[in-house]
Amino acid sequence: MAALPVSAMAQGTNDGLGGGDVDIKSLYELVTKHEQKSKALNIYINYGTSYQTTRDSREGEWTSRLYNRDLRLEMVGWLTDNIYYRFRHRLTKSNTAESEDNFAKATDYMMVGWKFNDHWSIQGGKKCQALGSFEFDENTLFVYQFSDIENCIESSKAAINLVYNATPDQQFSAEISNTYTGKLKDEFGENAKVTTGKVTSSSDDETTTVDTQLLEKANHPLSYTAGWNGKFFGGKLQTRWSYTLRTLAKHKYSRMVRLGQKLNLDHLHWYIDYNMTYDDLDRMRIASKETVSVMAPQETNLYAGKVRYQGLVTKLEVDLAPDWKFEAKGMYETASMTQSEQYKTTARRSATSAH
């Protein structure tokens, strides 16, 4: 696939107040040409579009299109020295309120925070979960292609996050959030089933037997995340690590480890992320799409269970000139059903890109 991107630069990373990008002026400053004195309201517009040409190797056909990758409105500010807020809304997603949190999927952020002092703060509302990895925290306007696993992470949830800045370079967080934005039946459909992970095949009649269970809603479908963002050697080495335990359904859980490391030099930036997720219920549905129709073609609403996803993602950025940079990105991902001999490695994907 080839793409010619056009972007309107704005801040907008997924962490905190989204101020990871530098030299970004607010809409007020761009329009009035005056320096903004107040911190109460900063308005940003994030917009990215591209012309894409794609070849489908299965059909041997080329297709082209103009594609609106992202369009969102963002407002950030400090109302007092202690109270801050962030609002981010995508104009390319549904505005219908979800059944669990009553927020629309279009709303990424509607967060209010209280800063107790230089060390402690608390945030609440809808926000991006405090997950590790550097790919997760990138402004989507500047991402040519996400990894499959990252592309399946729905991170904007109603949450409460406690943040502790031990030093200016070491931050720790503890967060409780909803696992879903909708009810279980809205996420997986009526009478959904999940495999227990046990799949047996008979060599005599060439049949496959799949052990399944009916999904039941959990009383407390919540996620618990512990995170660490660190900087060393004046910010030249950075980390974004997290561990998450999610309640997916009754007696169905997910464990997620995300470890991001980044080398951040003056003209060279390079990160390596490792992600591992072990799901009792295939929340990302990647393995389910590959295996369920083969394992149990008679089932109409079945999801894989005991699924493990692993991924390595790396990205290199080299600043060639003030307005020019070279980027190269690679990823390697696997999905497996750990308790099935037949599907211990069900999907494997690797990809590279440079631009």
Language model features with spans:
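Detector for outer-membrane/organellar transmembrane beta-barrel domains
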Residues: 22, 36-40, 83, 219-336
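Aromatic- and glycine-enriched pocket-lining scaffold segments that form the walls
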Residues: 146-242
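N-terminal periplasmic/intermembrane-space "pro-region" immediately following the signal or transit peptide
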Residues: 2-48
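Outer-membrane beta-barrel translocator domains and adjoining extracellular loop/strand segments
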Residues: 54-61, 66, 95-106, 135-141, ...
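Outer-membrane beta-barrel architecture
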Residues: 29-30, 72-74, 111-113, 161-163, ...
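Residues that define the transmembrane beta-barrel architecture of outer-membrane proteins
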Residues: 62-69, 103-108, 154-158, 218-224, ...
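Predominantly the C-terminal beta-signal and adjacent terminal strand-loop region
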Residues: 326-355
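Outer membrane beta-barrel
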Residues: 32-54, 60-182, 230-231
